[in-house]
Swiss-Prot record:
Single Gene Ontology MF annotation: molybdate ion transmembrane transporter activity
Function: Part of the binding-protein-dependent transport system for molybdenum; probably responsible for the translocation of the substrate across the membrane.
Native organism: Azotobacter vinelandii
Name of the protein in question: Molybdenum transport system permease protein ModB
Transmembrane domains' residue ranges: 17-37, 47-67, 88-108, 150-170, 197-217
Subcellular location: Cell inner membrane
Main localization category: membrane
Family: Belongs to the binding-protein-dependent transport system permease family. CysTW subfamily.
Pfam families assigned: BPD_transp_1 (PF00528)
UniProt GO cellular component terms: plasma membrane
Length: 226
């Protein structure tokens, strides 16, 4: 059989992780992107830089500090222990939290660009019709920014699927609990099981190509990033 039970388990876990992370990224990233697109605060540059840090930081550096923060002596770790949730490292929940931090700029950037492209005119028209802020956002902004949401969701999902360094630092290598496809490929290569590694790696290459093809061949991609 080309794929073992451990391979299939890693695929299932990766898809679950990417799906849940993408939903959380959209929930967290949307208000951040909206604030960055609309604010004139002097903090805009600093907040934007913090959000974009995962783009330039080595995954091991980000993973290390997340591990310390979520550990038993870190602020997040102390909070989760106080709430009776234990610590997050080496758990699926820890992977989700780390993935949200790591993939956040891939969601915020296209959303911010989409919000900025809307301009002031549609918002002014909605205001003259006495639409409230929430009504304006959900009935005017969201439909106009739909290409940006699609782009953000695709990029967030794809980036989460391909994570390795942060996942390994936070989740370790626990079968059916924290072992993703990327970690499973690493295990196969380390054990010189190249045939098994080829099946998974080839699938990742095909998946990445299809994602990029869908983005670059769609006008929605250009609208979301312009």
């Amino acid at each position: 059989m080309p794929l073992s039970e451990h391979d299939l388990a890693a695929i299932r876990l990766t898809l679950e992780l990417a799906s849940l992370t993408t939903v959380l990224l959209l929930v967290v990233g949307t208000p951040i992107a909206w604030w960055l697109a609309r604010t004139r605060s002097r903090l805009k540059g600093a907040i934007g830089a913090v959000v974009a840090l995962p783009l330039v930081l080595p995954p091991t550096v980000l993973g290390f500090y997340l591990l310390v923060t979520m550990g038993p002596h870190g602020p997040i770790g102390q909070l989760t222990q106080f709430l009776g949730l234990g610590t997050l490292p080496f758990t699926f929940a820890g992977l989700v939290v780390a993935s949200v931090f790591y993939s956040l700029p891939f969601v915020v950037q296209p959303l911010q660009n989409a919000f900025e492209a809307i301009g002031e005119r549609p918002l002014e028209v909605a205001s003259t019709l006495r639409a409230g802020p929430w009504d304006t956002f959900f009935t005017v902004v969201v439909p106009l920014a739909r290409p940006g949401f699609i782009t953000a969701a695709i990029l967030g999902f794809a980036h989460t699927v391909g994570e390795f360094g942060v996942v390994l630092m936070i989740g370790g290598n626990i079968p059916e609990k924290t072992r993703t496809v990327a970690v499973q490929i690493f295990d196969h290569v380390e054990a010189m099981e190249y045939a098994q590694a080829h099946w998974l790696a080839g699938g990742m290459v095909l998946f990445s190509f299809l994602v990029l093809f869908a983005l670059y061949s769609s006008r929605r991609f250009k609208a979301g990033l312009s």
